Amino acid sequence: MPLKFCMERGFQSHPVRGCLVGASRFLSCIKFLVSINPESKSRATNREVLNELIKLHGKTSLGGKLPAYDGRKSLYTAGSLPFESEEFVVKLIDPEKKDKERAEREYKITIRIAGRTDFYHLQQFLLGRQRDMPQETIQFGHRGDIGEGLECWRGYYQSLRPTQMGLSLNIDISATSFFKPVTVIQFVEEFLNIRDTSRPLSDRDRVKIKKALRGVRIETNHQEDQIRRYKITGITPIPMSQLIFPVDDNGTRKTVVQYFWDRYNYRLKYASWPCLQSGSDSRPVYLPMEVCKIVEGQRYSKKLNNKQVTNILRATCQRPQQREQRIHEMVLHNKYTDDRFAQEFGIKVCNDLVSVPARVLPPPMLKYHDSGREKTCAPSVGQWNMINKKMINGGTVDNWTCLSFSRMRPEEVQRFCGDLIQMCNATGMSFNPRPVVDVRSSNPNNIENALRDVHSRTSELLAREGKGGLQLLIVILLEVSGSYGKIKRVCENDLGIVSQCCLPRHASRPNKQYLENVALKINVKKSQQSSLVLMSHTPPGEDSASSIAAVVASMDWPEITKYRGLVSAQSHRQEIIEDLFSVGKDPVKVVNGGMIREFLIAFRKKTGRRPERIIFYRDGVSEGQFSRVLLHEMDAIRKACASLEEGYLPPVTFVVVQKRHHTRLFPEVHGRRDMTDKSGNILPGTVKDRQICHPTEFYFYLCSHAGIQGTSRPTHYHVLYDENHFTADELQTLTNNLCYIYARCTHAVSVVPPAYYSHLAASHAHCCIKGHSSGSGSTPGNEHDIVKNSAPTLQILVKVLDFQIVPLTMKLKSSAEDIVALALSKHRVSLHDVYVYHGRRVIAKSLTLESLKADRDSTFLIMPRMRGGCNDTIGGFKCIPLEQHIRSLGDSLFEIIWIPPDLRVSGFCSYLIILGKPARKIICQLLKLLEIIHAANRFASRFTIADLVFLPDLGCIAFKKGVKIRWNLRREEYKLNMGDVASIISCWFRFNRRKLEALEAGIHELRPGQGDSPMFVDILVKDLRSPTHETGLSANYRGFYKNCSALRSCSAHMNLFTSLDIRKDFMVGSADWGNFVKALGDIKLPGWYRTAMRSPEMRKVLFFEFNDPHTGELRGKRYRALSVFSWLEFARIFIKHMKKGLCTDKQATALLCVIFSNIVPVVEKKLTYSYRPPAKEKSNESFTVEEILDPS
């Protein structure tokens, strides 16, 4: 069913002021396409070229028309031009170059007609019959210094928007941060607050500068006749007096200081400072800071510190009367009536702000506990307090303690805790005044250990007394920001305790309002209610979602005060919430899921009834995405409801919440108490939904909060869809009333609480996952990276064998041997002799990261050395001829064959599991395939099965001593890798057990970019079907070479397993261990196998610890990648635990057979397994899987 935007509107009556502009007449508009050769990505350059064209040919070839140009491809004129297509040539002088002969550049401009556009659609739109999008711009004006090398550009924002009275010009003051156009030396001095520039920069300072200047454009000034521009990509780790580079093809090398003196006769003053680097790491350009100047007009997009935020807010934070006056002055200054483009297109702008009617909604009556002196409360101007009031449901805190990382004295911390406890008890909570352990201070440099120590001591003490666990940890933060995210992550992710963070500047001098807010937060964290709204409305409030895919939903009725939140990871900058409803495939049935479905189930469990109406407050949607978001998310809501019960489709109201807009409302008369609050802003509850709103769609502006400083910004609520058929009064009153039950403070908030809570959930998830900071009132508002090591460090990626790649933070002086030692310790692997690969080459272990010129996220591969040693050992490991090993396989349960790195370029799918008797046949097929690959890639030497050996300690095959394999890696030739080989083997593996049609279906299910060389597999499949197949995989070499040219375009690795059923087609090496464990959970087996899965020994096999790639700290555990070691260890530990009286050897072995049969489809369900008992047992037994799975 198609969705249409809601078309209802409301009506209001009290005066509020806005800004209006009208269009006097409607003209015929002609659109032309512009192409400029040579092309330029800069709009400014394109505009200069076109302005030059208008100067030269405006009155002649252009017929006196003044065209409007967008700086790209489109040009508009008010009326026709004398031509339909014309080419012009103009010459433009580059003002940056002083040699005008070289600076003059010729441009060819082609203008051709694209179509005629009249303004009939605009008329229809303004009459409410058509929908369109506004055009917006931001104009910059005055500037102001905000510190640390940055400046604030103050200007104004303007957008032409449709309203019920015609076109409206919306103007507002705007400000943003830019780099100051100063020399890089000056920027560094301000940014680092350096006084003595003769001293060299520390590594800590160098890292800070690199982060601040990366991507910034600079221009050089050491050549008088030429100015060149570069983009900064990094900073050199050593000073330019020591930085040596080749200056010619003869190998001549000089330092940067020497080069500038010899080439430009320029003596560098800051020789102890590093150079800026431009270009790539392979071809760097070194630029001394003192000859570089930051190009003007570059926006600073990184996070500002507290001081800079304060300075930039001062530029725009103005009282309503001052802001209105400033906007009016801007309108007069811009002289819209004299604008030549406005005159050309017949637009007239009124200079006066226009009065529009509005109304003020009454605040709701709030309900508190009957035990308090005041049982109800009527907010005054959007605010109230907790004096003589008790929370509706006061929480209980019996076990708590406090930990301080600040410089507050112990007696100050104890006094704050006492005041907070007194406030909690006074407002209706039950708070034990005695902590579990004494309040203490701790070293801020060791936050994680301090938290773990407090948790350990309190848990031990409470366990002895039988009092449960720690219920609340009060934490006094550092004076400097940066610790909040780490504390939340450790407390909630690792330790599982509730924490309340407080800023030392508030805790040292707490006032009653602050203590009330903290008490309310603690009560909410104990899942209790602080107050209720006495409402006559029946629809339950539903959830909201922020741009980071956090969704919250109300869980009580009819109070609507308790909310539950869910967070879902999704694509970067994805505005649609992808996980509202999901469908999973199970071998037995279809499994429905998603956040909306979970909320509906939780609501029913909590209240005993299903939701009869849903109100969806949706945040984080831009206007251009309204239709797309509505269609996708309404469909998800309907599917989630229908999945619970057939025919269950509650009516939904879909409301988009927007705070980031530039509409401001001013009182009609400034200073009147009946029209303004204390800050001079409009009264809380002011709502506007006429005249300045959309001519057809249902939306309104609501200012639900009282202003604190500056001019209040009303929240824009856009009703996209309304099946509940709300009137404007009903939805506006409901939204306003909800703003009074935000659980963390005693005043009305500016945004409806579900939207607020979704932002909190999203930011909290970032804190717990990445250690980011939060903007809470009792916690810090920002966080900066802290460089812990004075020595320069670099994050690299290391892969050992086939374990998962892990990030390691190493010093630049670290050698390859240091990398090996740390990586092996991380994986708990012991290897005696290894190769270290950097890129595609083996490196010496003595080489350092600095000498290798490694950059961030460089990848290193550590593999056992497979050649050398005596005849019966390789790399210290015992080896036996592969033919002898094949003969010894017999009827063994399974065998693991590992593909050595010599045979795989990419390292994908590097080993196979081979079960039972087919092992010999499969290895023979492997050798046949290697012959095909040999022919395709032109090995330096041929080999046979006699050249291969088996290493029982590693469970892998390798080439014996003296066999050398070389790949042809020329780019112009297509090269097969062992990912292809392993995939082909797996195809043959399945082919031997299934129908050929299933194999072909699995291959052709691949989508572009999902697999590699599908044509090669097709060739192989055709060859499998050929009559010669009985003698092995003797491929048609001519046919193969004939199709080789088509294979060169394939780039990704072949992966035939991603789109297949995990229960049936799970292949070792093609998916992670986590999916395997999930598959185990789906297998219907007796419950006794879980004991082994949860044992400490098994957990060491299942998981490995990994480090945070940003902080380098131990962050948690992750499933191991499948490796030969973990598989063998898994089987050994599994059988060991099964034999501890839980099952017989026969059952344990059979269960292992069942598990492996779900990984590699080797056996049918009723196939009889062969069980090989220990030596002490006399005879073998045979049994079927059904016997083991029989519950009886």
Swiss-Prot record:
SUPFAM superfamilies: PAZ domain, Ribonuclease H-like, Ubiquitin-like. InterPro entries: ArgoL1, ArgoL2, Argonaute_Mid_dom, Argonaute_N, PAZ_dom, PAZ_dom_sf, Piwi, Piwi_ago-like. CDD domains: PAZ_argonaute_like, Piwi_ago-like. Residues 183-296 form the PAZ domain. GO terms for cellular component: cytoplasm; nucleus. GO terms for biological process: regulatory ncRNA-mediated gene silencing. Keywords: RNA-mediated gene silencing. Residues 472-770 form the Piwi domain. One of its GO terms (molecular function) is RNA binding. Belongs to the argonaute family. Ago subfamily. Probably involved in the RNA silencing pathway. May bind to short RNAs such as microRNAs (miRNAs) or short interfering RNAs (siRNAs), and represses the translation of mRNAs which are complementary to them. This is Protein argonaute 13. It comes from Oryza sativa subsp. japonica. The lineage of its organism: Eukaryota, Viridiplantae, Streptophyta, Embryophyta, Tracheophyta.
